[in-house]
Amino acid sequence: MRRNTGKLVAFLAVLCLAGLLGVVAAQIDDQLTARRRVFKPLGPGLRAVRHGQNGKYYVLATPSVGVAVFDEKEKQLTVIGAPAAAVPDKAGRPGGAFGEDCDVDAQGNVYVLDRVENLVSELAPDGKLLRSIHVNGPVSVAALPEGEVAVSTLRGSHLVTVYGPTGKVVREFGEPEEFSSRQEINQLLSEGRLGTDPQGRLYYGYTFRPEPLVRQYDRAGYAGVDFEFTGLDAFPEAQAARKEIIKQENKRTPPYFVAILTAFGVDPATGELWMALHNTLLHFDKEGNRLSEYQIYTPDGARLEANTLLVEPERLLIGEDPLGVFDFERPDKKH
């Protein structure tokens, strides 16, 4: 009887292990290879890709380019916010602004965030400077309706600060998360990038959070859907990240963490969200349920470590500095 019981336990253990391995293996649904590179020759210094309501594309490459504007057929039209012909620095790079993020509003005005100068500059479609807002430690920028602009910061008491048309603060929301007893660690781990949708909602993607998370907010700042990567295949990386937090907790040196969530984008039609974790691409429905997981590659078969992601109805535009921006067929729209 004991022998039969032992065999049964062993059989069940093997069955459970097989099921577990099957679940983990099933998480990677496919390997996606880009169809082609777009917006050539931009690549080095790539920071952001945006699609305006006017049909134009806006590609931020820094520090030497500025915001390059392309038409619907991906032909370059002009450059906005290009650095002035300044004296190169000792490293041989052009002087001038260092754009880290950008966005475009319904009127075609472009907002460029400069982390070095602590400025968010609004530029007209012809490149004329309309206004500049001084922001302490800006990280990401998003244009909102009615002339408002949202900025995420590294040093603020809230995650998001919204400025009105006059440049004054009109509201703040989002509380930094508690990961550590050290305030500087909590601030860094709460750092995030911004995105929007046509309904005026704002999305906050935590760059360094152990469990990758993009949180949806309405325009007033009330939290909505959480798009969070959890599960068996997310556990090892999250566990390693939390161990690193504990390790740095006891150090007296400035904290440093490797980015986990590197890009995200929202489907303007459905509200579904796509999230990039370096070479891994995750797809969520509008309710925050994870649908699929992919590995992404260039047409030449090189790993694509995404730092920009733009979702369109029939394709994904995914970019990496310095490789450039690539066109992917949407796997959920394959016929």
Give the location of each predicted region:
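Bacterial N-terminal signal peptides
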Residues: A10-L20
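Eukaryotic scaffold repeat domains enriched in small/polar residues
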Residues: G22-H335
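Bacterial N-terminal signal peptides that target proteins for export
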Residues: R2-L12
